[in-house]
From Swiss-Prot:
GO terms for cellular component: endoplasmic reticulum membrane; mannosyltransferase complex. It comes from the Eukaryota. This is GPI mannosyltransferase 2. Its EC number is 2.4.1.-. It comes from Chaetomium globosum (strain ATCC 6205 / CBS 148.51 / DSM 1962 / NBRC 6347 / NRRL 1970) (Soil fungus).
Length: 471
């Protein structure tokens, strides 16, 4: 049923042209956020000018004394907080150990994109210390982030259609992703929007595999089903290269393995069961590879002297293995998070951080509530409650994703810098569907949550552009 403020004609237009609706809503939201960024410059300089100095570069000399255009100002304001690390890594790879806390995915994509543009002669190769090169990387990072955000909304819309077969719910969920409380983090050179795109795409392929498994259509063969599953694992693995919490996307694979184990125990030689378990194993391994790959690269660089990158022959033997190299499961990511960023179980539970917990509480509650409701089968669209074999597999996918979402909230509250939950939650579809379901049903709580999302993203945008917390 259309909301009361919409005319039937407007409601029909939205449903007839869902992609146009998403595109126009996306453009309007981005213009709103960018206006906030530019408006923040009227208040004064950013609290920390690292982003602006990074983009100027030492080669520009008196660049700080020259007035910057709106475009340059926008780029500089968006290159704040962790974006500085991503842009720097895109320019010259990881140099300092603590930079390994930031996923290699975005720097790799930006670097590859710029190298491609250099190869075809669209842009010049960067100088040794050229400030313009860093502007190029920052701009490329912004373009990648915004493009990924748009595509992730479109993919989430398609995913909702495959899972729920409900256009209204799917469209509302995608629109909620557009106005995510992650706000400018999905517009700046950060990894969240790319993570969401890869995660939603992986879930879409996994859902298509669930549909193929239960279909009598000759085009939906077991081979096609298994290819969907493996491809989903590859995309989840790529998402993990962008953000380490992508490992939680392995939950559907684990649940599917458990679902097929009884059949394997009864008939260990059944070809279809063996093939299905093999596909799930390959897909799950691909998810894990997204985390293990960067860890292995770091181990070769820091723990094996002959492989140390960036050291000359005379310096190579002076490099001593780092403390984390001696661990039972050596992980540079775990070490730098603890050593440099003070990430660990209950380490963030201090009185000065209480305001950050209060800011994160609404999103934590939404994640836990929506996850628990989905695990219990509550607040699902009406059509989803008539479960056949195919829908049962999809509901298993939803519940495994909901469990991963709840685990993410628990980890954020106990181990992470809790305030990041508002942005990293953008890559999880269940809470979008849960909130969309409430809105479609006319639930006033859903409307209040949307109001919170818009207000939070607006205020956070002004603070981010001024290099002020929370980040």
């Amino acid at each position: 049923m259309a909301p009361k403020h919409q005319t039937p004609h407007t409601h029909a237009q939205i449903h007839t042209h869902p992609y146009r609706t998403l595109l126009t809503s996306f453009a309007a939201w981005k213009l709103f956020l960018f206006a906030i960024v530019l408006g923040s410059t009227l208040v004064g300089d950013a609290y920390d000018t690292s982003g602006g100095l990074l983009l100027q570069g030492p080669a520009n000399g008196d660049a700080a004394t020259r007035p910057a255009g709106l475009g340059t100002t926008l780029i500089a304001r968006l290159t704040s907080w962790d974006a500085i690390y991503y842009v720097s890594a895109a320019r010259r790879d990881y140099v300092f150990e603590q930079e390994w806390a930031f996923g290699a995915g975005l720097p790799f994509v930006v670097r590859t994109l710029l190298q491609g543009l250099e190869y075809v002669g669209i842009i010049d190769a960067p100088g040794a210390e050229g400030g313009r090169a860093l502007v190029a990387e920052a701009l490329a990072g912004i373009l990648v982030a915004n493009t990924a955000h748009l595509l992730s909304a479109l993919v989430l819309y398609r995913l909702g259609q495959v899972v729920w077969r409900d256009q209204t719910l799917s469209l509302v969920a995608a629109l909620l992703h557009v106005i995510s409380p992650a706000g400018l983090f999905l517009s700046a050179p950060y990894s969240e929007s790319s993570f969401a795109l890869l995660s939603f795409s992986g879930y879409l392929l996994f859902a298509l595999g669930c549909r193929a498994e239960g279909s009598s259509n000759s085009n939906n063969s077991p081979t096609r089903r298994d290819l969907y599953t493996i491809s989903a694992g590859v995309l989840f693995g790529a998402a993990t290269v962008f953000r380490s919490n992508g490992l939680l996307n392995g939950a559907p694979f684990a649940l599917e393995v458990l679902r097929h184990l009884p059949a394997f125990v009864r008939r260990p030689t059944a070809i279809d069961t063996l093939r299905r378990l093999a596909a799930l194993g390959v897909g799950g391994a691909a998810v894990a590879a997204g985390s293990l790959g960067p860890q292995a690269a770091a181990y070769l660089r820091y723990c094996i002297p002959s492989s140390s990158s960036g050291a000359s022959d005379g310096e190579e033997n002076l490099l001593l293995p780092r403390p984390w190299c001696q661990g039972y499961l050596p992980s540079i990511f775990t070490f730098v998070q603890q050593h440099y960023w003070n990430v660990g179980f209950l380490r963030y539970w201090t009185l000065p951080n209480l305001p950050l917990f209060l800011l994160a509480t609404p999103m934590l509650v939404i994640l836990v509530k929506s996850g628990v409701d989905s695990l219990r089968g509550r607040h699902l669209p009406g059509d989803a409650k008539a479960v056949d074999g195919e829908s049962g597999r999809l509901l298993a996918l939803i519940r495994s994703t909901a469990a991963a979402q709840v685990l993410l909230a628990v980890l954020a509250a106990t181990t992470y810098h809790v305030q990041i939950i508002t942005r990293i939650s953008s890559g999880y579809p269940v809470w979008h569907w849960w909130l969309a379901g409430r809105l479609v049903q006319g639930d006033k709580t859903g409307s209040r949550i949307v109001m919170f999302m818009v207000i939070y993203a607006s205020i956070q945008g002004a603070l981010f552009a001024s290099f002020l917390p929370p980040a």
